[in-house]
Curated annotation (Swiss-Prot):
Stated name of the protein: 6,7-dimethyl-8-ribityllumazine synthase
Pfam families: DMRL_synthase
Keyword Transferase (UniProt): yes
Function as written in the Swiss-Prot or TrEMBL entry: Catalyzes the formation of 6,7-dimethyl-8-ribityllumazine by condensation of 5-amino-6-(D-ribitylamino)uracil with 3,4-dihydroxy-2-butanone 4-phosphate. This is the penultimate step in the biosynthesis of riboflavin.
PANTHER family: 6,7-DIMETHYL-8-RIBITYLLUMAZINE SYNTHASE, 6,7-DIMETHYL-8-RIBITYLLUMAZINE SYNTHASE DMRL SYNTHASE LUMAZINE SYNTHASE
Organism lineage string: Bacteria, Bacillati, Actinomycetota, Actinomycetes, Micrococcales
Keywords annotated in UniProt: Riboflavin biosynthesis, Transferase
Active site: 93 (proton donor)
The protein's Enzyme Commission number: 2.5.1.78
Species this protein is from: Pseudarthrobacter chlorophenolicus (strain ATCC 700700 / DSM 12829 / CIP 107037 / JCM 12360 / KCTC 9906 / NCIMB 13794 / A6) (Arthrobacter chlorophenolicus)
Binding site for 5-amino-6-(D-ribitylamino)uracil: 31, 63-65, 85-87, 118
Amino acid sequence: MSGHGAPDIDLTTLNPAETSQLRLAIVAASWHTQIMDGLLDGALRAAKDAGINEPTVIRVPGSFELPVAAARLAPHFDAVVALGVVIRGGTPHFEYVCQAATSGLTDVSVRTGVPVGFGVLTCDTEQQGLDRAGLPGSKEDKGHEAVTAALATAVVLKQYS
């Protein structure tokens, strides 16, 4: 499983005075509702763990639209998290959407200096998405992980602003 070797970042060990003041936006795609609901629940749980009770949450149609939404939000927030699911089909569409979302979100983060948590699942099967969505019985919680990474990075970057 891809989570092997992942860092153990506990948001509760970060300074709550720092994390609770962070402005967090979560941009969530709409395809694959069950998986997306799990990702979003995990992301909101991580925000709450960090003392952020009401992050801004917006929905976009799909993963292809995540970068433009993140770009619009980034200047107004300390961290942005992008959540989406792309499942391989029988055409090259999978590669195009995955590449566009990945490079677009990376570009937003580097260009704005705002961490963008990458919670876009790129799966060969729906089961792989379910296994990573933080649902009961899931092996991983990528929504939680994406928020944790973005907020931990935002705390580090605040030290250098």
